[in-house]
C-alpha cells in the first residue's frame, strides 16, 4: 500500500475520552488532517476502572463492556467523519487500539486484554478496521508494549541529535531515539494516573488543572522514597505496566505506612514521582539533548518544570514544537500501525518489546461493501 487516509482511535489508561485522529499516510509522511475527542460516559469509565483494578467480574460483564466500547469507538469515528465532512469512502482503514483492561506481560503465559469489538466498529462505520495489535508481539515473546516507540522513531528521530520522546498519559513511557543505537522504549511508571485518582477522590475533579493543587502542597520526602522503592522502578527494560498495578489500591498501601500527610502534599509528591522516575531513566541512558513530551502530562507545568530541573543540559519541550500534536500522538500512532499492517510491514521493535523478531501486528476486520 503506497498511501491512504487512516483514522486512529485511542482510549488510554487516563480514561479521559476517546481520541480520534484522521491522517494522510504514506511511506515518508504522516500528515494530520483532523482530530476529535469523544466523551467517555461516566458509568462506562467506572465499569472499566472496576475491571482494571481487579474487582471480581463475570464473562457476561466482560462481553457487555466489549460490545459497549465497540459501539462507542464507532460513534467516535462517525463523529470525526461528520466534523471533517467526509464519508466512509474517503477512508482506507481505521486503526483501533481498544481499551486495555488487563496487561500481564510476565504471566505464565503472558497476556494482554483490550476490549472494544472491532467487528462492530467495521460494521457501524463501513470502514475496514485493524485492531488487536499487542497480542502478536506477545506471541513472539514480547511484552506487547510499548508499541508507540516505532512511530516516534519514524517521525522524530534525528541523525545526530540525542532525542527521547516521553508520552505522559495514565502511564508514562519513554522512547530513546539515540543515533546509531537500536531504539529502546519502556514504561517508566505512573504518569497522570495516580494524580488523577487522588484529586478525584479528594476534590471530585477529573485532573489537576495546571497542577494548581499540587503546587499548593510540598513534596513529602519519606513518601516519595517509599513509593520509589517499589521494585518496578529498578526493573530493567523491557518492561511495561498499567492500571492493574499502579492504581488507587497501590497508593493506599503506601499511604497506610505514613499516615497523616496532607492531601495536597500527596498530590505534590505524586507529581514528583512522575518527574523523578522519568529523569532517572533518561540519566541512566546517558542523557539526551532534547526530551520531547506529549500526552496530557505535557500540560502539567509542575511535572514539566521538575523534569527540566532534574535534567540540566536537556531541553524539555513538547512534540507540538516539532509538528506533531501531543494530544493526538497515540491515536496517530495506531493509524500509522494500521497502515503498516495493511502494507504487510512489521510494526513492533524487538529492541523495545523484547520480542524474538519483527512481525506484522494486529488483525484486519474487513467490510464486504460500502
UniProtKB/Swiss-Prot annotation:
ATP binds at residues 12-19. The gene is anmK. NCBIfam families: PRK09585.1-1, PRK09585.1-3, PRK09585.3-2. This is Anhydro-N-acetylmuramic acid kinase. Catalyzes the specific phosphorylation of 1,6-anhydro-N-acetylmuramic acid (anhMurNAc) with the simultaneous cleavage of the 1,6-anhydro ring, generating MurNAc-6-P. Is required for the utilization of anhMurNAc either imported from the medium or derived from its own cell wall murein, and thus plays a role in cell wall recycling. It catalyses: 1,6-anhydro-N-acetyl-beta-muramate + ATP + H2O = N-acetyl-D-muramate 6-phosphate + ADP + H(+). The keyword Kinase applies. Pathway: Amino-sugar metabolism; 1,6-anhydro-N-acetylmuramate degradation; Cell wall biogenesis; peptidoglycan recycling. One of its GO terms (biological process) is amino sugar metabolic process.
